């Protein structure tokens, strides 16, 4: 029995890498005086793939920086998706271009002047296009992008999200590829909601206001952050990822609804020289857009942002409140215009959807009255089209649906045009 087992072991072939015999593996591939099993082939393939991905990421990063669109090209792209806000688009185009050119300089690691990071603060009313501008930029540059609501953030140790979760969301967007995340854009919305609650220091700790600003300082400026992949509070034992935030572009945005009053007070105080000086000028009410364009860091400090936080956001740009004409253009002109979206949705049912000029003007007027900017347009159109979208899948032989001003005004049924197979009928005529 012993001799037979020795003979069997001699006849078996073994993998030259892991030492397993042919019975312990699925496949054993032979070469000149050497063998390799399927398990070792898979392992080698994984190693090569991992190295290739790393190399591709480095090359991809260099290519993105080297083939960066010029400011004119960036603005032109923004014009296709965002109506108005020309000055803000120029500011963003230059800021983003300079930011990624700075990365090229950083990667070269020359002994030249070190370029600082220029994060951005967007100030503008609800629905003026702040979020859309940032999203459009990220798509153009093909970099990871994440949106965080500042109101959900709290200081570490308190109920709410830690500020590190901002970077964790960015990592999720690029499947935890740290190198890609370090080139991303973080958009922090509602930044005005974390303003300091009072000018005077309080005994009660302001964990969702000044505390969050303090916690964000290092992250925005640039630091080596330890990020838990699955969130630190629920999984405290996990291995942390090291992410350098020095090259991440932070765009903070908010409505800053009371800021114009602070600016107005400062401007009025500056005109009070002499007895009854400039009384006529003071009585003239200045528009909110005009006042916000005069904003200074001292106004933001009075609003409740701490000086150190403002210092990390050197580029401040103001978005104008959208006019009725601008809302009309938003409905029709951009590549992803709302009316085009709903027309595409109806085309899936082989039905044409048309709005006449008067109905579009009325929709814009309704949004203006609600004071919700472009954000309110979708809810208005949803309300107008709800009944027809409910009935349409069950209807047959529909060719076209026409929306006129009476549909928008009184929510009556739209005009329905049937195909040639049936006699023409119309609802709401």
From Swiss-Prot:
Cellular component, GO, one term: HslUV protease complex
Pfam family, one: AAA_2
Gene3D superfamilies xrefs: 1.10.8.60, ClpX chaperone, C4-type zinc finger domain, P-loop containing nucleotide triphosphate hydrolases
UniProt-annotated binding residues for Zn(2+): 15, 18, 37, 40
Domain ClpX-type ZB: 2-56
UniProt-annotated binding residues for ATP: 125-132
GO terms (BP aspect): cell division; proteolysis involved in protein catabolic process
Coiled coil: none
Annotated InterPro entries: AAA+_ATPase, ATP-dep_Clp_protease_ClpX, ATPase_AAA_core, Clp_ATPase_C, Clp_protease_ATP-bd_su_ClpX, ClpX_bact, P-loop_NTPase, Znf_CppX_C4
This protein's UniProt keywords: ATP-binding, Chaperone, Metal-binding, Nucleotide-binding, Zinc
GO MF entry, a single one: unfolded protein binding
PANTHER family listed in its UniProt record: ATP-DEPENDENT CLP PROTEASE ATP-BINDING SUBUNIT CLPX-LIKE, MITOCHONDRIAL, ATP-DEPENDENT CLP PROTEASE ATP-BINDING SUBUNIT CLPX-LIKE, MITOCHONDRIAL-RELATED
Annotated function: ATP-dependent specificity component of the Clp protease. It directs the protease to specific substrates. Can perform chaperone functions in the absence of ClpP.
Assembly with partners or alone: Component of the ClpX-ClpP complex. Forms a hexameric ring that, in the presence of ATP, binds to fourteen ClpP subunits assembled into a disk-like structure with a central cavity, resembling the structure of eukaryotic proteasomes.
Family: Belongs to the ClpX chaperone family.
The protein's name: ATP-dependent Clp protease ATP-binding subunit ClpX
Species of provenance: Buchnera aphidicola subsp. Acyrthosiphon pisum (strain APS) (Acyrthosiphon pisum symbiotic bacterium)
Gene name per UniProt: clpX
